[in-house]
Amino acid sequence: MALSERLQGMTVAQALAQRATTDPEGLFLVVDDHRVTYGQVEEEAEALAAALANLGIEQGDRVAVILTGCAEFVVSLFAVAKLGAVLVPLDPRLSPSELRYMLRHSEAACAVTVEIFDGVDYLQRFEEFFPLLPELQYLVTVGEDDLWYDDRIFQFEDLVSAGVGRHFEVSGVRDPDDLFAIVYTSGTTGKPKGVELSHRGLLHAASAAAQAVGLTPEDRVFGVTALFHVFALGPGILGTVLSGASLVLQSEFDPVSALDLLELHGVTVHYGVPTVFGAELREQRRRPRDLSALRIGLVAGAPMAEPLFREVEAELCPRMLSAYSMTETSSIVSVGRADDPQEKRMFTAGRPGAGTRIRVVEGDGSELPPESLGEIAVSGPGLMRGYYRQPGETARVIDPEGFLRTGDLGMLDEDGYVHLVGRREEVIIRTGSKVYPREVEDRLHAHPAVWDAAVIGVRDELLGEAVCAAVVSVEGAIVTAEELKDWCRLTLADQKVPDSVQFIESIPRAGTGDVRRSELSRRVGRGERGPVT
């Protein structure tokens, strides 16, 4: 039976239960030297769900999970699914104000959290949070310590042990279109929004990615360190379950240990953002590993520049695919295929998966013909239910026909492949002409002395907006701003050539790989390392 057919009527909890029934001894998770089977995750998730139910957590309650790449995150995800509750995955790196905002906005009744992360004591942080978050009833901690004097705080292992063999009831019918997760956007252009995703949507995205890379039970998957991200939830965790593959986890990304894991475990499928593959490429050149098992990689979150794409295929992973993903579409919108020619895999974001429809539209919503540049609009099973507690914002972005206005500019070619240009709000208007940052960035990335680059518009009295390039040079390389401008003039129209070039230590990016352009603007405004023009 085709994978898409198996998904009919399936929920997230049922996906794991089916896999654990058919292959209980199959290897699901590899964390350091710890191996966890599908049967073990099913048993622990069932026990944790029972323990949470005994505390009063019920269907529809929001459960925040604030963990790194660990088995406890995966167990928590499926426990929430079994309860019919709603998962709220959050980044442990969030500032106290960001974390408090998301916990309050989601109305989380319970939080599963790391105890210590990057020097931050989360037990201390939540002691401060409790009086400010009246909806928050319980805290479940993953670690060694325990606040024994607080009856609202429990250790993860204790709850799992307490729930073994305990029966729990879930009222109501679990439907694939029920709300399963509220995933917060990265907030690169404003306050984060809570995106409501269904069981069906996440499983659809998982299926699309699994089919694109040809996942099988023999595969070992790597590259979903940020488990709180929508790509990790769908293609990462659920895609692995649907295929019966194994998932190799890393608590925090580090290129040295990442390549060691790829070699040690014979990883065959690698997901990641461009910066991950770039860091691994540099490390592989420094100390080569045997990566002969690696057969395919999938890059999402942000486009990969042509030079890096070619180098990764030549030196790291023999076949790379590109995907277009958004939180609002449960991750995958379109994805390349292994049998696509290299030009399509490199310069496009592939084609929409089964059931997904893509239009390119004018500002008034009218559909444009192929090869026309406009705003990408998407509909299909992966589309969000809406923004949590923001009906006005939901109505603004989803039209009456059920298409999401993504804010991304691009086109569909005659073969149905998606070409991305950039975000609508990122377009620079220089003397009345539109300049798309992606086009200039691609040209800069092609220079051998440029490691990374991002382009923004800055206010200018004469030009309206000037084109400013922020550049990270290759270590040891010497290049000037004028050289880079001349390089751009070889292929770009005059109005697209950067008016200024500023060399900086690093490009600020979100975990998705997207440039944090507001932060970059502040750095450029401060003259970090001094402008070179």
Task: Give the role of each language-model region.
Residues 158, 264-272, 281-344, 357, ...:
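Gly/Ser/Thr-rich phosphate-binding loop
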Residues 117-176, 283-284:
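ANL superfamily adenylate-forming
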Residues 4-13, 25-70, 74-78, 95-100, ...:
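Conserved AMP-binding/adenylate-forming core of the ANL superfamily
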Residues 42-47, 164, 176, 180, ...:
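Conserved structural elements of the adenylate-forming
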Residues 351-355, 364-397, 435:
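Conserved ATP/PPi-binding loop(s) of AMP-dependent carboxylate-activating enzymes
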Residues 50, 94-104, 111-115, 270, ...:
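AMP-binding/adenylate-forming catalytic core of the ANL superfamily
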Residues 203-220, 228-269, 283-285:
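Conserved AMP-binding/adenylation subdomain of ANL enzymes
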